[in-house]
Amino acid sequence: METVQGYVILKAATFETGHGFALGHNPGAPSPFVTWQFTEGENGHRDYYWGRYGTSQAWAQRDFDCRVDDYQQLYHAAVKHTELG
């Protein structure tokens, strides 16, 4: 999977809109877990932003799930595909 700012992307969900969310891990970072929103371009390149950083994988998984659910409800968007690292 992709590495962003030293974080390996463990999981990602992309919506039909080209937006999505990712969960990353960097065991050497002070906050080893992150969730990001991203925008995926036509060539598949992703721009990551609005990171939320935490210290536990359980927290990161909950945050990832909440962000995906909130986006689905707010924009009535379907998940196009998910990836697991």
Report residues per predicted region.
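Short N-terminal "domain-start" leader segments
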Residues: 1-34, 77
